[in-house]
Amino acid sequence: MSTFDLTVRYSRELSNPDLPCHEEHFVHGEMSWSLPTEQTGLVLVDCWDQHPVETHLQRGGQIARDHILPVVNACRKAGIAVIHAPSPQTAEHYPQWTKYAHDYELSVGHRTPPEWPPKELRQRSGDYASFARPQEARRDDVRAMQQNRRIMDFLGPKPEDFVVSTGPQLHRLCHHQGLVHLFYAGFAANICVQRRDYGVWAMLERGYNITLLRDCTTAIEHSETWDGMWLTKASILDMELRAASVTSEGFLNALKATA
C-alpha cells in the first residue's frame, strides 16, 4: 500500500502553559501524518458552473482552475478516489450518482418530509407565514439556475470518479472503498463545505479524518466582510478547530515525493 507524508495544521483552543490563556495567544499547531492513498478520498463540494452571486462564481472559478484542478489531476494519477458531491439536484445529472444510492433514493419523490415540526412551519405558510423572510426579487432566476447547473466541466467527473448526492451515500461509498481520510475542496466555505450532510461537520461526526484544502475554497462574503475576505478566513479557522488543513501546494508536493 503506497503512502504519502504530509504536514497539516490545526487551530489550537488553548495557549502555551507559559502564557495567559487569552485568545490573543491562540495559534496554529502542526501534525505530521503518513496517509495510505488507498484509504484517502478527495471530496469536491458544490463546484458548480453557475451561481447567482457573480463575484463568488468568478472567484471560485479561478480557485477551481488554479488550485482544485491540479489537485484533482494528481489524485487521479495517485489512485486517490475523486468524489464529486454537487447537491442532490445536480448529482442526478450524472449516472455515477446511482452507484451508492439506495432503492428508495432512486424513486421519484424519495425525500420523505419529517413529521415534526409541522409542514406549515417548515414552509413558513398558513399560521406561520409571518415568520417567512421577504421574497428576493431574483428568486425565480435562482430556481431556474438550480435546475440547469452542472459541475464545472474542466473538473469532470471522469468515468472513474464517484458522484454522490447525500451524506449517507458518501458514507456508504467510503465504507465500500475503505476510505477513512477525506480531503475537502469546493464552495462555499461558510455554507455548503461545512453544512451539507456530506460536508465537513457531518463527516467529522461520523468519525472520518478530515483535512480542508484551505486555498481550494472561498466563502460567500458580505458587505461587512468583503474588504478582507473575513468570512473565508473565519470559516477556515472554524473548521481547523476540529479538522486539519493544508494548502494545495503542500498536498501536491507530498504526492510528488511518493511518485
What is each stretch, according to the model?
Residues 1-41, 54, 58-60, 69-73, ...:
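Active-site-adjacent betaalpha module
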Residues 45:
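Active-site flanking residues adjacent to catalytic metal/cofactor-binding acidic residues
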Residues 48-53:
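Short acidic, Gly/Ser-rich segments with clustered Asp/Glu that frequently serve as metal-coordination loops
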Residues 64:
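Aromatic/His-enriched, Gly/Pro-containing loop or helix-boundary segments
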Residues 82:
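Active-/binding-site microenvironments in catalytic and ligand-binding cores
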Residues 85:
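Aromatic-lined carbohydrate-recognition surfaces of secreted/lumenal glycan-active proteins
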